[in-house]
């Protein structure tokens, strides 16, 4: 465990954070680049677009049957893919017709607070306090995000930083002047720290 780490970018960064939060008995180091945090901001903007796209397709089941036929996942189509994928992960329901619950009503478009509450329970910023002992046990916790992240993840990273500080969780938080894409060069900031901590 003391020599095992995990890192990732975007949704992979989210996964790395969750491994540190929930499985610190297996991992001693975590590095997250632009990981999903503070779901109100990072997913909130896609919700209305997903409503429009799924409704125009004739509902969720019909959209699921046809979405792969699109040449480009641009604009509202990407928003729909994002929200449907997140729904399958954050709000699975084997009794639902498609196996998961959407965070909104397709009929009215209104948000479903009970489903969004399930999502929020998987948001790293909401888990810091309860999992602070696990995070404190890490030999390295690194996270960063560009100040121009298109999914507003820089706000989530900053909130995560403040929550970690409030819970006395040692961590390295960095900001940089860039967006969400093509930031592989940022591994030069995290991997040396992770490597030194795990040797």
Identify the function of each model-found stretch.
Residues 1-199:
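Non-catalytic cap/lid and distal C-terminal segments of serine-dependent acyl enzymes
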């Amino acid at each position: 465990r003391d020599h095992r780490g995990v890192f990732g970018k975007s949704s992979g960064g989210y996964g790395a954070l969750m491994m540190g939060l929930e499985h610190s008995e297996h991992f001693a180091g975590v590095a997250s680049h632009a990981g999903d945090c503070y779901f109100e901001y990072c997913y909130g903007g896609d919700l209305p677009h997903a409503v429009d796209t799924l409704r125009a397709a004739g509902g969720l089941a019909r959209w699921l049957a046809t979405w792969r036929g699109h040449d480009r996942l641009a604009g509202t189509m990407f928003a729909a893919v994002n929200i449907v994928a997140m729904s399958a992960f954050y709000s699975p329901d084997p009794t639902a017709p498609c196996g998961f619950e959407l965070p909104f009503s397709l009929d009215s478009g209104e948000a479903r607070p009970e489903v969004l509450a399930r999502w929020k329970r998987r948001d790293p910023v909401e888990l810091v306090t309860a999992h602070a002992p696990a995070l404190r046990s890490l030999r390295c916790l690194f996270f960063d995000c560009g100040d121009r992240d298109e999914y507003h993840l820089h706000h989530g990273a900053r909130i995560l930083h403040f929550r970690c500080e409030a819970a006395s969780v040692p961590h390295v938080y960095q900001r940089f002047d860039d967006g969400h894409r093509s930031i592989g060069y940022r591994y030069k900031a995290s991997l040396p720290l992770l490597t030194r901590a795990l040797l």
